[in-house]
């Protein structure tokens, strides 16, 4: 779909929608003291408001690097987004019934946004997903389709054949009928026919956010309009503080089917009624410098990336790429999704300091799909803070500073949680831990989702937890059990790892992220630390992605041997562990989630079945 930013129709003002009779209508958000508070009770209402107040303002600019390596800009205004979403909504109701799910399987682009907004306008439940690639994510997408059982799939003409072939097989296991597949760009989105926004329902549920599933199969988190709007308000308040300037022009390459990509790229611009500049994840991976260039050229104020995105930007952005560009206006770059590496943040700020990027713009943030996306970050105007904790003390659940930085776990602070209520809890006794003691992070607030789709047992266990003997001023429940391990140290939150990902080697607990951080100081690329069983206990195995650099086979063999020795020595020195096997593989070999997190359980299976193609086999 090639959009034309000059295409507008004057004089059309949407009317206030009537509540439907299906699900309970979403209630307005009341009682907030934030300057970002809003009375709109659904995302559909917010889109209608943006279209009414700023019809001619650019809403989304998508930079298409496939059409033109220099970047071809496609633009839609708020009026266009609302109008096209209404046309999609009318099409959906030809086939849909109240409460139906509508999956979105489309390439990153404006059509994805129109599809998502169309589902919300129709009062149906959106299920944002990636396009199936018949690769490592096949079963995960199939699992989400079987679980959500959509009646309709929205896609685009460029991939409709692939999606139409794929969908029946993905849904067949449940015995459900194949969903109807609709190409959004094949609809008459420029139609001038009269549209009635009051005909559609306003149910409480907005969409299902399927988790990235680093430790289990993806699960659909049920998120209400209230959850999403609340979290937007929390996020903006914490990132912007008391500033009168709301962040304009988000720049994002994060996939729309990921929680932060959806929030930053689609929803937050709608709430701010401003313009988002977007590109595809593939465009970023092909040339990471594009991200920094867009931040500078569009005077962006807010963006986001996981840890690996920062690494790629550092390694693959040259001074020539940044010639004449300035990043002084960038106020917030959120980093999360995977554990934040302190060394990565240091390299990033040092690399782009000559282009006026302030270190206070880097905002390590904690969140999860079960809490919509965002839970905590340090206050604005502060550079990232880290503390070096003693490895051995952490392994027994105590957070104590180490005097020797080389012998400790350097963890980044996520500040004192303000948006949500957070407690550190012993997962066995369900009692609150004192400050300085590691435990499971429990979260409470209106941003916490309603549960897992069609999984009441797991919903009860995860979203309905109750504290035993809560401290004064702390409610008994319900609480969200995050599955993340953390500690409150000197009044601030630090994340130590995942409960299910703790490595037990020789009877002692070890955080895999700490071991991986040690290795990355040597290798710089993606790495995964896993524990695999042997005859008596579990042994430590590390899998490291490396690019070939030796000019000859002999040079490459010597390099691989050197890396093996350095990795084994560093882990022994820092963690007092012996590595049973150091596996070196080509980039892209380690299985990851859709958000870039390493999948440890899948890595264990591949290792045990000898499925890694080892570069070190010849060394």
From Swiss-Prot:
Pathway(s) served: Lipid metabolism; fatty acid biosynthesis
Keyword Cytoplasm applies: no
Keywords: ATP-binding, Fatty acid metabolism, Ligase, Lipid metabolism, Nucleotide-binding
Database matches in Gene3D superfamilies: 3.30.300.30, N-terminal domain of ligase-like
Source superkingdom: Bacteria
Catalytic activity line of the entry: 17-(4-hydroxyphenyl)heptadecanoate + holo-[(phenol)carboxyphthiodiolenone synthase] + ATP = 17-(4-hydroxyphenyl)heptadecanoyl-[(phenol)carboxyphthiodiolenone synthase] + AMP + diphosphate; 19-(4-hydroxyphenyl)nonadecanoate + holo-[(phenol)carboxyphthiodiolenone synthase] + ATP = 19-(4-hydroxyphenyl)nonadecanoyl-[(phenol)carboxyphthiodiolenone synthase] + AMP + diphosphate
Listed InterPro entries: AMP-bd_C, AMP-bd_C_sf, AMP-dep_synth/lig_dom, ANL_N_sf, FAAL/FAAC
EC number: 6.2.1.51
MF terms (GO), sorted A to Z: adenylyltransferase activity; ATP binding; ligase activity
Keyword Lipid metabolism on entry: yes
GO cellular component term, pick one: plasma membrane
A GO BP annotation: Actinobacterium-type cell wall biogenesis
EC main group: ligase
CDD domains, per the entry: FAAL
NCBIfam families, alphabetized: PRK05850.1
PANTHER family the UniProt entry points to: DISCO-INTERACTING PROTEIN 2, DISCO-INTERACTING PROTEIN 2 DIP2 -RELATED
Described purpose of this protein according to its UniProt entry: Catalyzes the activation of long-chain fatty acids as acyl-adenylates (acyl-AMP), which are then transferred to the multifunctional polyketide synthase PpsA for further chain extension. Involved in the biosynthesis of phenolphthiocerol, which is an important intermediate in the biosynthesis of phenolic glycolipid (PGL), also called mycosid B.
Family per record: Belongs to the ATP-dependent AMP-binding enzyme family.
Protein name: 4-hydroxyphenylalkanoate adenylyltransferase
Organism, scientific name: Mycobacterium bovis (strain ATCC BAA-935 / AF2122/97)
């Amino acid at each position: 779909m090639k959009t034309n930013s000059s295409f507008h129709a004057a004089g059309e003002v949407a009317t206030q929608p009537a509540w439907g009779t299906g699900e309970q209508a979403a209630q307005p958000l009341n009682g907030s003291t934030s300057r970002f508070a809003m009375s709109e009770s659904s995302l559909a209402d917010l889109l209608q408001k943006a279209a009414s107040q700023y019809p001619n303002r650019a809403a989304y600019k998508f930079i298409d690097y496939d059409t033109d390596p220099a970047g071809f800009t496609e633009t839609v205004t708020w009026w266009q987004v609302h109008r096209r979403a209404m046309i999609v909504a009318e099409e959906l109701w030809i086939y849909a019934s109240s409460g139906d799910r509508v999956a979105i399987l489309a390439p990153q682009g404006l059509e994805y946004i129109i599809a998502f907004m169309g589902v919300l306008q129709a009062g149906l439940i959106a299920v944002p997903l990636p396009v199936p690639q018949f690769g490592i994510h096949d079963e995960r997408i199939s699992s989400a389709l079987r679980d959500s059982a959509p009646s309709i799939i929205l896609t685009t003409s460029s991939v409709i054949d692939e999606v139409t072939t794929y969908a029946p097989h993905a849904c067949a296991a449940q015995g459900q009928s194949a969903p109807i597949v609709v190409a959004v760009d094949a609809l008459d989105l420029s139609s001038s026919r009269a549209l009635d926004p009051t005909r559609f329902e306003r149910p409480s549920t907005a969409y299902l956010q399927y988790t990235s599933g680093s430790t289990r199969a993806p699960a659909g988190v049920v998120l209400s309009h209230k959850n999403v709007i609340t979290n937007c308000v929390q996020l903006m308040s914490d990132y912007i503080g008391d500033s009168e300037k709301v962040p304009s022009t988000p720049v994002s390459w994060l996939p729309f089917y990921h929680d932060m990509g959806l929030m930053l790229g689609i929803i937050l611009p709608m709430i701010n009624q401003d313009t988002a500049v977007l590109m595809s994840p593939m465009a970023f991976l092909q040339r990471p410098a594009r991200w920094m260039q867009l931040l500078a050229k569009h005077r962006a104020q807010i963006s986001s990336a996981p840890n690996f995105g920062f690494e790629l930007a550092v390694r693959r952005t040259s001074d020539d790429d940044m010639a004449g560009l300035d990043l002084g206006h960038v106020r917030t770059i959120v980093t999360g999704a995977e554990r934040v590496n302190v060394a990565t943040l240091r390299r990033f700020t040092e690399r782009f300091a000559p282009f006026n990027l302030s270190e206070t713009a880097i905002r390590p943030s904690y969140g999860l799909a079960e809490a919509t996306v965002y839970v905590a970050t340090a206050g604005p105007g502060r550079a990232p803070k880290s503390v070096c904790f003693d490895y051995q003390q952490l392994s027994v659940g105590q957070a104590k500073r180490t005097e020797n930085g080389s012998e400790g776990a350097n963890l980044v602070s996520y500040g004192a949680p303000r948006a949500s209520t957070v407690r550190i809890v012993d997962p066995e006794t369900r009692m609150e831990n004192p400050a300085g003691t590691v435990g499971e992070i429990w979260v409470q607030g209106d941003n916490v989702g309603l549960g897992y789709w069609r999984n009441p047992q797991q919903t009860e266990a995860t979203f309905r937890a109750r504290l035993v003997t809560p401290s004064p001023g702390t409610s008994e429940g319900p609480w969200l059990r995050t599955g993340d391990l953390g500690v409150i140290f000197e009044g601030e939150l630090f994340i130590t790892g995942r409960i299910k990902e703790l490595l037990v080697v020789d009877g002692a607990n070890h955080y895999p992220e700490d071991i991986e951080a040690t290795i990355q100081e040597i290798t710089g690329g993606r790495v995964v630390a896993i524990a695999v069983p042997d005859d008596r206990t579990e042994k430590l195995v590390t899998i490291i992605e490396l690019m070939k650099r030796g000019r000859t086979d002999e040079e490459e063999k010597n390099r691989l041997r050197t890396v093996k020795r350095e990795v084994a020595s560093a882990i022994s020195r820092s963690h007092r562990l012996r590595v049973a096997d150091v596996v070196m593989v080509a980039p892209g070999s380690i299985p990851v989630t859709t958000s870039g997190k390493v999948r440890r359980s899948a890595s264990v299976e591949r290792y045990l079945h000898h499925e890694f193609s080892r570069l070190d086999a010849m060394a």
